[in-house]
Amino acid sequence: IGNMHSASAPPPDESTFFLHMIQAQLARSAQLVELPDHVGTLLSEPKNEIIVNFPVLMDDGSHRVFKGYRIQHNNVLGPFKGGLRFHPDTRLDECKALAMIMTFKCALMDIPFGGGKGGVKCDPHAFSEAELVRLTRRFTHALGANIGPEYDIPAPDVGTNAKMMVWIMDTFMNIGGGDRSAQQQRVVTGKTLECGGSVGRDKATGQGVVHC
C-alpha cells in the first residue's frame, strides 16, 4: 500500500507513537494480504472523531470542565464497540489507536461489531462517588445520539466499572424520553448483573490474556 498518511502530517512524537505504530502495522499487514489501496486508506483513519467538553458540579460547589472522546473507527461489520476509560492520560490519538485495534479484533474473531473507543481525561480516584456519578452522566449527555444499542455500544475499560455502565444506561434512557425497554438497555455492555449484565464479564479480559 502506498502512503496512507497525509503528506503534511508531522512526524510522530511520544504522545502519538502508539497510533503511528498501529497505522504502520496496518500498512505492513495490508501489503501481505494484498489489500486494495482504498480499503487500507479507509482503515487507516476513524470514521468519526467525537470530542466533547462538558461541565461538572463538584462537591465544593465549583464547576470543572472535562474533555471527553469517542472514536468510531469502522462499522462495516456491525455497531461500533469498545470501552470507555477514565484516566489522566486519556488522549485523542490513544483512543484512535485503540478503536482501530477493536475493529481488527472483532473482524479476526468474526464478531459482528466494529471498533470504537473513548474516555474522559480525568483521575477517577480523585473524586467522590457523587462527583463520579455527575461526571459520567454529563459525559453521556454530551455524547447524546452518538451512542446507542444499534450504533455504538460502550463498555468498561481502565478507570470505569459496571456501576458506571449502569449510570450511562440510565442517563441514555432518560435522554431518549424515558424509554426503558430491554432494547435501550443494550446501549452498554459490562453492566451489573442486577441491571442486565453478563456473568463473568468482570474477569473476561484477564481470562482472555491467560488463555489466548
What name fits each language-model region?
Residues M4-A204, V210-C212:
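N-terminal ligand-binding/catalytic initiation module
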